[in-house]
A protein has these predicted regions:
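Conserved helicase RecA-like core
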Residues: 66-455, 490
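Intrinsically disordered, low-complexity segments enriched in polar/charged small residues
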Residues: 8-10, 14-19, 27-31, 37-39, ...
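General helical secondary-structure elements
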Residues: 1, 5-10, 18, 22, ...
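A generic alpha-helix propensity feature with a strong bias for hydrophobic helices
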Residues: 35, 41, 51, 61, ...
């Protein structure tokens, strides 16, 4: 329900997907221009989108509770506190320490924290603690977490699952690109908490497979990206269906005027916590702008990809991602592509291969720019510079997470330099700028670049051995003589494998 009047000028949202083609690349031709999308030539010299100033944050009428020093100081179920200990989570991050005392008390929360700052537990623990002990009816969840992408939905669900189990809450993930039948079954069986992308949740509601009138706690994670991706009409339509007077929590890495509509319309006397500067700067992150000649960029990219260690490389278009990935594989670099043109099972498999080290280079469009956490990732490379300072911050947010160190490297050709200077200024970042050439010490020192082996590689799915299942119907029955004779062979094989 609308709590305050809204301003129509904030209801106009940007169109298009974060994964849509945005120009050409040295690794692929220009993607077809979508309706309403500005024309760009060659993918170089593009003018960044003008940075939007942050809106005036709402004033808190009711005083907020002070931050806590430890989880034990919070009014949470003992099972949740025990689960935190078993997961090795002992000290709250700043955004958790600041918001949890208020969210646990049922206050609306507007929180800003950089990517990797611990936002998931900041809202997740409060939602689980306040929902614990309740039981959802079929198709009627009690808590809702809205996120912009499938990858972020899966990461949020994975992060919260052990805590949900500790308080006997059922959690369902509702996203596009996956079996809708399984999601329907999960909702029919009863799920107290649903993590969802707006489009698939709307589809399920339209089918009659989900209702939101019992949702008492609603979370919007990465609200600014949902606005940027054109999801605002769907998001507001969903929020209008949840229980009136319920708790709302909005978390994001940036809070610009695209989010103002949601704050004005759905948050009531919110507690505002901003634990990071507006630019999202991270002290453990280094920013490098590498000036390269256009003719040298292709080779420089290949040498960086051949480094020892993992790296995420961002390009603008799906076609460019596929072209670069094919080139790297032919050059002897274990690379995999990630973009919106891949099916969800393919994307999940690729991320697993990257996280486990089966592939060293993840070549991606902005589909990977949010919600993907990879431990010990120390390098992100913008092969194609982003056109928006928020995209830059969220691409870079894949490294230097949770106090770790990392570097963000952007390859810039001569005709891109002016635009890159503007973008960095909008992001509040002063990068280290270096002129580099392939094979030179500066490129090796900053990125670990080295010549690839030149021996083509093929990435295959890792073989996972599964234990043989014994048929339940054979219990208490005499096996045929042929089966009995084969039994020692199977036993011997299993023993050898062990």
């Amino acid at each position: 329900m609308n709590r305050t009047r809204t301003n129509d000028r904030f209801a106009r949202t940007r169109t298009g997907s974060a994964d849509s083609g945005r120009g050409g690349s040295r690794f692929g031709s220009s993607a077809p221009r979508r309706s309403g999308e500005p024309s760009r030539s060659g993918g170089y010299g593009r003018r960044p989108v003008a940075a939007q100033a942050e809106f005036a944050l709402p004033k808190t009428i009711t005083a907020a509770f002070p931050a806590v020093e430890g989880f034990a100081d919070l009014d949470m179920p003992g099972a949740l506190l025990a689960a935190l200990g078993s997961q090795g989570v002992t000290v709250p991050f700043p955004i958790q320490a600041a918001t949890l005392p208020n969210s646990l008390a049922g206050r609306d929360v507007l929180g800003r924290g950089r990517t990797g700052s611990g936002k998931t537990l900041a809202f997740g623990l409060a939602l689980l603690a306040r929902t614990a002990g309740q039981r959802a009816e079929a198709r009627q969840p009690l808590g809702l977490i809205l996120v912009p992408t499938r990858e972020l939905a899966q990461q949020v669900a994975d992060a919260l699952t052990p805590y949900a189990r500790s308080v006997k809450l059922r959690l369902a993930t509702v996203v596009g690109g996956m079996s809708i039948g399984r999601q329907v079954s999960a909702l029919r069986g009863g799920a107290e908490v649903v993590v969802a992308t707006p489009g698939r949740l709307k589809d399920l509601i339209d089918r009659g497979d989900c209702r939101l009138d019992q949702v008492a706690i609603t979370v919007l994670d990465e609200a600014d990206q949902m606005a940027d991706m054109g999801f605002m009409p769907q998001v507001t339509a969903l929020l209008d269906q949840v229980r009136p007077g319920g708790q709302r929590m909005l978390f994001s890495a940036t809070l610009d005027r695209n989010v103002d509509l949601l704050v004005r319309r759905y948050l009531s006397d919110p507690v505002v916590h901003s634990v990071d500067p507006a630019a999202g700067a991270v002290t453990t992150m280094e920013h490098h702008v590498l000036h390269v000649h256009g003719a040298d960029k292709h080779t420089a990219t290949t040498e960086i990809a051949a480094r020892d260690g993992r790296v995420i490389m961002f390009l603008d278009t799906k076609h460019a991602v596929d072209r670069l990935t094919e080139h790297l594989l032919n050059s002897g670099v274990r690379a995999a592509a990630l973009h919106g043109g891949k099916s969800q099972p393919q994307r999940t498999r690729t991320l697993t291969q990257f996280k486990t080290g089966h592939v060293n280079v993840l070549v991606a469009t902005n589909v990977a720019a949010r919600g993907i956490h990879v431990d010990n990732l120390d390098l992100v490379v913008n092969v194609d510079p982003p056109t928006d300072h928020k995209d830059y911050l969220h691409r870079g947010g894949r490294t230097a997470r949770a106090g770790e160190s990392g570097s963000v490297v952007t390859l810039v050709t001569p005709n891109q330099r002016r635009d890159m200077t503007r973008l960095m200024a909008a992001a509040g970042i002063v990068p280290q700028t270096t002129q580099v050439r392939t094979g030179e010490e500066a490129l090796r020192r900053i990125t670990g670049a080295q010549a690839p082996s030149g021996i083509p590689v093929v990435i295959t799915a890792p073989v996972v051995e599964r234990p043989k299942k014994r048929g339940a119907t054979s219990r208490g029955r005499r096996r045929p003589a042929s089966a009995a004779r084969r039994a020692p062979v199977r036993q011997s094989t299993a023993g050898a494998a062990a």
